[in-house]
Amino acid sequence: MIDRLIDEEAVRTSPIHFGLVMTELGSLRSVQCPIEDIPEGQLKDYMLASSACFPALRPREIDGVKYIDGGWRDNMPLDLAAKMGAAELLGVDVDGIGIVRPNTTGLPTRIVRSHWDLGPTLDFDPARAGRNIALGYFDTLRLFGRCGGTAYAMLPDNEEFLARFAEQYQKLLAEVCARAPEIDLVEKNARQRANYPAPYAPNPSAPTRGALAPLELAAEHVGVPEDMPYTPKLLAATFMGSFDKDPADRFPALLDGRDNTLVAERAIAAAVPEEFVTALVSKTLGELPIL
């Protein structure tokens, strides 16, 4: 496949300066290789060595020396990019095997990270690869301010649906906290455990990542697909169509004031805060016009 896809001459003459990192197997020494240091005719060998994820893949031997994946010693070679003349850096952290070295370049740096589990390093399933490519695209758009959200790619909210959702969500949350004051901490804990931003500030109804967080968290919890963009209203509608039994039915005492099961529901909410937030989001959306 590499013979079919890689044109060495095109790489060498490209205005985009190419480089790679390998790890010398015997010494575990990191070897940085800008394109001009790679001998003519050997680029494909160097690329195979740089991606030889040992021990699953065999080392690649070059001039009598065995090399493995450069990520073992330097999984985000920002230093190499700086040495090659970069004025600012864009790194991609796939949370893979290997060492991510501290960024000591002093250059302006942005790092693309995914909220989602990207799967095993050696999972080459085409469907997963397509999903991860889409997620990487959305994560990059988000980093450069072209879309919003934390987990989902959120498009502009031209209908101000998010503001209405946030206002109603905060109203219902305050009512629940009046029945069970610890629920405020439960809601914050759900965000923290699922890597979502803290609650709203300074305006509870402002269309911020914090305001989106409960809706995104609930959508993730019920399995709303993550590899497509959404407006807040579309995400809400997709969430509401993703279950047969309403999550809000699990917390009638907390959400509707039926005291007969309040103690048990408080315990459940504390144990699985994501379940409670999902229920509260469902209750909120049930009181808003979506379609």
State where each predicted segment sits.
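Patatin-like phospholipase
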Residues: M1-L291
